[in-house]
Amino acid sequence: VTMDSSFYRQGNIFAVLIVGVYLVLASCCMFYMLSRVMKEKYEKEKLLYISNTDELTRCFNRHAYEERINNLDLREEWIYISMDLNNLKHTNDSLGHAAGDELICAAANCMRESFGKYGNVYRIGGDEFVVIITGNTKEFQSIIESFDRRVAQWHGKLVDSMTISWGYVFSSEKEWDNIYDIAKEADERMYKNKERYYQESKIVRRK
């Protein structure tokens, strides 16, 4: 073995070590950059979730609702359902707000379980909810009947039973001027059902 070949081998080893160190450093940099991108993406998704989610029920909130209805197309087929808990004020006054919260959360769960496959549930006020269904509108009658059964079968720890008034509108019922006319019509139908509930149940409505 000559001295030149020995230097040559040492030079090769040194070159390999340099390349190896470079690759390790490059991999570390790429891993760091990827981790940072993933963390930023997670933080953005977390902020988006918080900004669009109702804290009590984990349904979509009013902010998400406003964004959704502003993107609905009147030329497409969908259903707008306005929903409102009955007797919530009476429950809060007589059993406490923990019982009222139990009702609100139970209502939200029943809505998600019944409508979650077909659309989204929004809590837009204290006991006010909206469901927007964009799929399987032809099966709506069986879906709403299933929802009514689910509500009727519910029993809580603080409250024995729950009733919910609703009113719905198909976007295809007629030509609407805007989305808010549909929302208004659904609200009016819901309030008619609510008045009927109080008349038939003989319960004095608290305002």
Functional labels for PLM-detected ranges:
Residues 97, 141-148, 152, 156, ...:
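Catalytic-core segments of nucleotide cyclases and related cyclic-nucleotide turnover enzymes
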Residues 88, 106-107, 129, 166:
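Hydrophobic framework residues that shape the active-site pocket
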Residues 12-55, 63-73:
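Signal-transducing coiled-coil linker helices
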Residues 103, 130-147:
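Short helix/loop segment flanking the catalytic signature motif in cyclic-nucleotide metabolism enzymes
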Residues 120-123, 160:
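A short pre-motif secondary-structure segment
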Residues 45-67, 83-97, 105:
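Conserved nucleotide-binding and Mg2+-coordinating catalytic segments in signaling enzymes
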Residues 1-9:
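Short, hydrophobic beta-strand elements of compact beta-sandwich sensory domains
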Residues 99-118:
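Active-site-proximal alpha-helical element of nucleotidyl cyclase-like catalytic domains
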